[in-house]
C-alpha cells in the first residue's frame, strides 16, 4: 500500500477492473457546473453498461438545469475501508470526466430507472419502487466518458 501519491501508473485500474467495480457499486458523486461557474456536487445512484454511465434524475433536479446549459460533468465512485478497518485496508477510486446528454424517451426512462433501482436496492424492491419513482417525472442522463483517473492502494508499492 502506498501513500506517496494518489494515482500512479502502478496503482491504476485496468478496463476490466473498472468495469467490475462499476458493475457492483451503486453510489457515485456527480458534479455539474452551475451558471455562476461553481460546482454542484451530489451523491447519486447510477448504472454502467460498459461504455456509458446512465442516471435517472427526478424533475426539478439542479443537475438537469446545469447539464442542459453545460454538458460537462464529472463523476466519482470510490471506497475507503481504511476509515473502519485501518490503513492496511487500502482504498480505491474511479474519477471520470465526460459529456452528458439528456433524454425524455419513455422506454429509456423506464429501462434505466429500473436498472438503477435493481443495482441499488435489488430486484424485489426495484419492482416495487419503479412505478412510484417514474410518477415523479424522470430524465435520463447518459455520461460518455472522456478522461479517467483511477487508483487502488492495494496495488501500490
Regions found by a protein language model. Give the residues of each.
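Solvent-exposed residues in well-ordered beta-strands and their adjoining turns
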Residues: 49, 58, 78, 101-103, ...
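Charged, gly/pro-rich active-site loop segments
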Residues: 2-13, 87-157
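Helix-adjacent hinge/juxtasegments
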Residues: 56-92
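A generic structural signal for nonpolar/aromatic side chains embedded in well-ordered alpha-helices
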Residues: 22, 66-67, 116, 143
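Short beta-strand segments
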Residues: 25-59, 65, 75-77
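Structured helix-beta-strand junction loops
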Residues: 24-25, 69-70, 136
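Amphipathic alpha-helical interface surfaces
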Residues: 18, 63, 109-113
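Short, basic/aromatic recognition patches
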Residues: 3-29
Amino acid at each position: 500500500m502506498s501513500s506517496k501519491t494518489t494515482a500512479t501508473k502502478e496503482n491504476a485500474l485496468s478496463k476490466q477492473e473498472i468495469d467490475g467495480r462499476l458493475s457492483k457499486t451503486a453510489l457515485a458523486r456527480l458534479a455539474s457546473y452551475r451558471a455562476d461557474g461553481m460546482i454542484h456536487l451530489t451523491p447519486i445512484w447510477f448504472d454502467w453498461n460498459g461504455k456509458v454511465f446512465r442516471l435517472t434524475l427526478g424533475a426539478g433536479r439542479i443537475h438537469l438545469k446545469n447539464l442542459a446549459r453545460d454538458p460537462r460533468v464529472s463523476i466519482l465512485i470510490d471506497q475507503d475501508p481504511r476509515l473502519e478497518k485501518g490503513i492496511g485496508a487500502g482504498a480505491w477510486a474511479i474519477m471520470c470526466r465526460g459529456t452528458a446528454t439528456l433524454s425524455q424517451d419513455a422506454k429509456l426512462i423506464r429501462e434505466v430507472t429500473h436498472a438503477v433501482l435493481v443495482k441499488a436496492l435489488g430486484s424485489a424492491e426495484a419492482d416495487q419502487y419503479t412505478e412510484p419513482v417514474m410518477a415523479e417525472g424522470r430524465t435520463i442522463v447518459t455520461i460518455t466518458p472522456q478522461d479517467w483517473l483511477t487508483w487502488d492502494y492495494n496495488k501500490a508499492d
